[in-house]
Design a protein with these regions (language model features):
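Active-site beta3 strand of CheY-like receiver
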Residues: 49-55
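Receiver (REC) domain active-site loop signature in two-component systems and cognate sites
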Residues: 60
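Helix N-cap/capping motif at the beta->alpha junctions
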Residues: 35-44, 65
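Alpha4 helix (beta4-alpha4-beta5 surface) of REC/receiver domains from two-component response regulators
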Residues: 22, 67, 90-105
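C-terminal output helix
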Residues: 111-120
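Two-component/phosphorelay signaling modules centered on CheY-like receiver
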Residues: 15-34
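Short amphipathic alpha-helix used as the core "switch/output" element in two-component signaling
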Residues: 44, 66-79
């Protein structure tokens, strides 16, 4: 499977942000992108279909990104999935919390395609080791 065939799930309660992330991924050559508007919907999609990568916002109603991450890491079928946390929160304690919960990476909004590309490459490299 080529890296461009990676199946992404973009999770954010703000549709504009989902569209921005989708467009940035498209710029980077990733066209297989689905969306969910919160952690509850994301978890249902992850359990019903096959995805290779999750890009999730932190602050969402119903189930936050960190709760989604914890659910993914606790699920035997999903725990291998890389999860990139996207948030407006640049607080050190949030970065530490995300790392402790098993986030594969962390990016602060707003960000560019180059920043996203750099984070994704780091995660893909660590997956291939």
């Amino acid at each position: 499977m080529g890296i461009e065939n990676t199946r992404f799930l973009v999770v954010d309660d703000f549709s504009t942000m989902r569209r921005i992330v989708r467009n940035l991924l498209k710029e980077l050559g990733f066209t297989n992108v689905q969306e969910a508007e919160d952690g509850v919907e994301a978890l249902a999609k992850l359990r019903a279909d096959i995805f290779d990568f999750v890009v999730s916002d932190w602050n969402m109603p119903n189930m936050t990104g960190i709760e989604l991450l914890q659910n993914i890491r606790a699920d035997a079928k999903l725990k291998h999935l890389p999860v990139l946390m996207v948030t407006a929160e640049a607080k050190k304690e949030n970065i530490i919390m995300a790392a402790q919960a098993g986030a594969s990476g962390y990016v602060v909004k707003p960000f560019t395609a180059a920043t996203l590309d750099e984070k994704l490459k780091k995660i893909f490299q660590s997956m291939n080791k």
